[in-house]
Amino acid sequence: MIQAENPLQEEKTERKMLNEIITSDASTDDLLKAIGHREDCRRDMSDAEIITTAITAAMFFNGNHSAACSYMKDHNLMPQMLEKSRFNRRLHNVSILIHDLFHQVGMILKESSGCTEYLLDSFPIPMCDNIRIFNVKLIKSEDYRGYIASKKRYFYGIRVQLLTTKSGIPVEFVFMPGSANDVRALNALPLNLPAGSEVYADGAYTDYTAEDDLKFTEQITLQVMRKKNSKRKDKPWNQYIKQSIRHYIETVFSAITCLFPKSIHAVTYDGFLLKVEAFIFAFTLKQAFIE
């Protein structure tokens, strides 16, 4: 016999969800003001409300914008909610703005947390299973066919290069094709960090030239896990410290990807990236301002 859910527990969960949505909306509005954003006051929905709805979709509805729009309207959180096609157009129009807001949060965390240790790694996001590559309509390029060594399987999609604080809050990210190795992505990240920062990464980021350049020009130390044949071997205790510090980023990846649906539905490649960015931004806001 299946027991009915506790009404008090349902009410508590609902209240917590509403509080997180309201906090996200307030945080988004404050961030937009901080970057001096202005918009047309004649619009039915503000950019902050559009972005908050996308964040709500990522946090609670597996990225389903239609479900999030209905929830926001039904609970009178966004009474002037746009219909589906208009909402999607507005959301695509603010995609760069979402990116700017993420980096604004990253800058705040870098400057205010006093953090000097950061974690760097990548995780794959498939657009489809490898056997269905020929049916993909979002993009067609062999550059997006990558390999997941831990699972010993190929995938077709992108890699997210993610830089987080030591406590696991994302501060920088970049999207790369699935086949891109980590050294290539290292050169794509801005790594706009305070002098004296240390970035912990696995052995796939081994690039002595980039390592020396960062140390000399930016005073940033790249703490890479050394391979057995490395020219710059670590002492055993240094290797242990690096491993214990960088291991936490795997937990961050799990926390972000657990919000994903089984497959991310998108009509265009830009729409796919926008949804992934919303998942990352939602996780960042929750870690930085809500929890």
What are the residue ranges of the model-derived segments?
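Short alpha-helical elements
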Residues: 1-291
